[in-house]
Design a protein with these regions (language model features):
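ER/Golgi luminal nucleotide-sugar-dependent glycosyltransferases, focusing on the catalytic module
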Residues: 1-304
Length: 304
């Protein structure tokens, strides 16, 4: 007797097709290649198109327009509202952006149908856990780790429990309107994280901290973009904080893939602290390096 195929709905946000022209095709190909037993449908939400737009891109792939007011978060809200009660016809909902494979995406190669099926047994959301060395606070909530918003899977019930995915709107008391000191003195963001955002988005690359691939100078002209991008980052963090507040654990994709492949079908998998989960990446890296060294020692001629 065959098990019913897992039903997954992807809500893929894009802003036009100039930067990632084949994003939805690449994502669908990944599902077909790595998860052929999954019944996959996709709703592409383009926040460069008017809200009333609607068309079909392909069989099982629908396109709608959305507001770009809060980037992917307001677009996801639009997609959820468009889907309506049909959202609960799926086993998992997949939040993604067109940049899902743009940065450090090796973990995506590990996801398969077994990982998705095991997720159904958890009270958790699956993605790539990012973290900072030092804890910080936003809106009085301590944070140190979060799920990268470009690729997250969870159950429809978990998603619906969040309501709107826009946690930090334009009226949030954060920004001063002054490019020389863009944050209000009473902004509900720790000073260290304010400095991180400034350096990440507008830094010159000096020092140990890395900077954003599209960094820019902060001027009166670029201030609105800075505020929008900073709010998007804060919305990403708050999405994780709200999931945690609802009792939904963070599940790292690399960790889960390793556990599923190592466990027997009868064994249960407990979700450990995020620090334990991300340490598995270091083990994977060490294993790959060891394999490379063994191959080189076997195939490369020795120096005399």
């Amino acid at each position: 007797m065959h098990a019913q195929p897992l039903r997954v709905l992807t809500l893929l946000v894009r802003h036009g097709t100039e930067k990632y022209p084949t994003a939805w095709q690449d994502l669908r190909a990944m599902f077909a290649r790595q998860m052929p037993d999954v019944a996959h449908r996709m709703l592409v939400i383009d926040n460069s198109l008017p809200v009333g737009h609607g068309s079909d891109l392909d069989r099982g792939v629908e396109l709608i327009g959305a507001s770009n007011e809060d980037w992917e978060f307001s677009a996801w809200d639009r997609g959820i509202n468009h889907t309506g009660a049909k959202l609960h016809h799926y086993d998992l909902v997949h939040l993604a952006t067109s940049a899902f494979a743009a940065s450090a995406s090796d973990h995506l190669k590990l996801i398969d149908g077994g990982s998705l099926r095991s997720l159904l047994g958890f009270q958790g959301a699956l993605g790539c856990i990012d973290s900072r060395r030092e804890a910080f606070s936003i809106f009085g909530i301590g944070s140190q780790a979060w799920l990268r918003s470009s690729f997250i899977l969870m159950t429809p019930r978990q998603l619906s429990s969040l309501g709107s995915l826009v946690s930090v709107g334009r009226d949030a008391p954060i920004f001063s309107g002054n490019p020389r000191q863009p944050f209000r003195e009473d902004a509900p963001i720790s000073q260290a994280y304010q400095q991180f955002l400034l350096h990440w988005l507008t830094g010159d690359g000096d020092g140990e901290e890395v900077i954003w691939h599209s960094r820019f100078d902060l001027t009166p002209e670029t201030l609105p973009f800075f505020e929008s991008k900073a709010r998007a980052i804060l919305n990403e963090l708050m999405l994780t904080n709200r999931l945690l507040a609802n009792g939904c654990a963070l599940v790292d994709m690399t960790w889960l893939a390793q556990k599923v492949r190592a466990a027997s079908s009868e064994s249960e998998i407990d979700i450990p602290d995020w620090r334990v989960q991300i340490s598995s990446r270091a083990r994977v890296k060490r294993t790959l390096i060891q394999k490379l060294r063994r191959w080189l020692s076997k195939h490369m001629p020795r120096q005399r």
